């Protein structure tokens, strides 16, 4: 496998820490050891997160093309767009963000706080669009790029989650390589990795990276899209493309992509009671915050799987904390009493 042949622009602090979740593990019976790899602490750029790791491989391409404007898309409370805005500010580039109405949640301040507030503070041109949730290529995003061209600029396209970008899976191949180095220091290997999946390139990169040591199917994706067929297809397609890029040396099989669909409800961006319980439990036992759109759902999945005995006794499970905490303020009504 050859990830090193791709240029990388450093946007993160370095390897993200692995934190034992001792109190949560004990609360759930102590038979499974839970750990968190803190991608939410990976950068000093506006809270960082998993997209910042991905952008390290996109930015060299943007600079090589002479782009002056990063153009991205997401929902109103998109973590992706906030991270793109931060990187643009850091590099002295312009930024145009298309923010679509992906979540059926009504709150008078939803489009004024959290991620979107931070993006505006960092100077991004934020454009609200009424279109609903979709993980694919969007006309509104293509229109935004054309508007930059018409104004004499040179846009660089960064799709939702970086996922439909040809290089979008590379960052989390690097995640897997990083975990292997940390495992050597820890003296053990993780039996499972739990990760939230929506647009797919985070899990896709992990699948490729862990396929190198036979653990592709030990990456358990927790669907948060509530459109799991599309998410599974996108993960698989991106993983196969990424495997070719890094010369993995073996094909990605359908069985390599594990996507658990039990925890996405009631729909994208809205938490159910199990998700809310998981968010509060992790916060109160570990001081680790998760959000109701993504990480709360993957935390719910991991906790429920432990309770159901779906991990063998003695298993060591690594929870990939991808970020997302800035969105919590947009859900203040849900958490008004904690």
Swiss-Prot record:
InterPro entries the record matches: ACCD_DCysDesulf, ACP_carboxylate_deaminase, ACP_carboxylate_deaminase_bac, TrpB-like_PALP, TrpB-like_PALP_sf
Residue ranges of the TM segments: none
One MF term in the entry's GO annotations: 1-aminocyclopropane-1-carboxylate deaminase activity
UniProt keyword Zinc present: no
UniProt entry tagged with the keyword Cytoplasm: no
Coiled-coil stretches: none
Enzymatic reactions: 1-aminocyclopropane-1-carboxylate + H2O = 2-oxobutanoate + NH4(+)
Residues annotated as the enzyme's active site: 78 (nucleophile)
Pfam families listed in its UniProt record: PALP
Biological processes per GO annotation: 1-aminocyclopropane-1-carboxylate metabolic process; amine catabolic process
This enzyme's EC code(s): 3.5.99.7
Cofactor: pyridoxal 5'-phosphate
CDD domains in UniProt: ACCD
Keyword annotations of the record: Hydrolase, Pyridoxal phosphate
Modified residues (N6-(pyridoxal phosphate)lysine): 51
NCBIfam families documented for this protein: ACC_deam (TIGR01274)
Self-association and partners: Homotrimer.
Role noted for this protein: Catalyzes a cyclopropane ring-opening reaction, the irreversible conversion of 1-aminocyclopropane-1-carboxylate (ACC) to ammonia and alpha-ketobutyrate. Allows growth on ACC as a nitrogen source.
Family named by the database record: Belongs to the ACC deaminase/D-cysteine desulfhydrase family.
PANTHER family registered for this protein in UniProt: 1-AMINOCYCLOPROPANE-1-CARBOXYLATE DEAMINASE-RELATED (PTHR43780:SF2)
The protein's name in its UniProt record: 1-aminocyclopropane-1-carboxylate deaminase
